[in-house]
């Protein structure tokens, strides 16, 4: 029987084993909390660390204990003036009871709060999406880095030594310490030689020669003590990692907000948008998100309005595509930005507009987009009705024509969270072949 030894280091002041056991025990509560955060939070913040609160009763490990509402106990209590021997003492009421009216007199407990790491948040988010393990690793993978110059350092590899900065420091140190120059020493040596070569100079300038020789000896000793280049002068080129690539992407989120799109449909759409954002965040340094919602009119809105506004009305899908085209022309030229689009709808559209949508995609948008994904959100009971992909609404049939002509267009139907991933399967399969626009 194999033995497994966990040699992973514990985080600072924490026990990794205890933390994992706690997360396993509280998994359902954490999944519910993360799901609520995904519903109410911003798409760009899903893969960040999360402060999670959960009831304190779920923190303690399971243990057997006496039932507080039944049983008989005998205690020896100190005497008092209120009770006599044989009196029955009522049980203490508590705030932990089943919903008593009023504040209560017992003690209650605050919620337990702790921080989930980015990896733990993504694990909980991916759990019911049924992503393959390799895709999970790709989405959670940190961005690649390239080393770039970032100043100088006093330590480093000899291959990174900066000669110019080193000699500059050496020169400043020699000036500050008054290191004798070669010119001064040569001038003294020439003066001594001149006096010695004069007729009778040795006797005539004996005292002067002695002073010059002492000065020369002192300068040479000082020059030897103060090196030309000292270890404190040496500077190395410093490098620090910076994320790659230096490309920018914009993600357009288009959604039908007519009356037929309820909370369930919007929740599935948001999960789809989150997954696409995580994929793009791994590939690009900067990502802008543009939210466009439409009924019979379309407009660019903020994220809160996009998901939670109560506006409703008819359905004209082409207005959203026209709004997207307008925003691209004004702010996101295709030669500078990598454009991705995700459209969520229940498939309802006004008569005759679906052909207009297909024409806009074919003639205008698909040539600008790196990838366009359309998801049609249906009821689980409808999955059997639409057994073949050719059946469906007029919008679905019109988009099938676009799907056959453009390889960067993908469409699918989703009825539950596990259906979201297949729309990315084609994108992940073609990832090495896709070329970024520069």
From Swiss-Prot:
Q: Which Pfam families match?
A: DUF444 (PF04285)
Q: List every stretch annotated Disordered.
A: 55-107
- Which segments show compositional bias classed as Gly residues? 92-105
NCBIfam families according to UniProt: PRK05325.1-2, PRK05325.1-3
Write down the PANTHER family for this protein, in alphabetical order: UPF0229 PROTEIN YEAH
What is the similarity comment for this entry? Belongs to the UPF0229 family.
- Identify this protein by name: UPF0229 protein Smed_1028
User: From which organism does this entry originate?
Assistant: Sinorhizobium medicae (strain WSM419)
Lineage at the top is: Bacteria, Pseudomonadati, Pseudomonadota, Alphaproteobacteria, Hyphomicrobiales
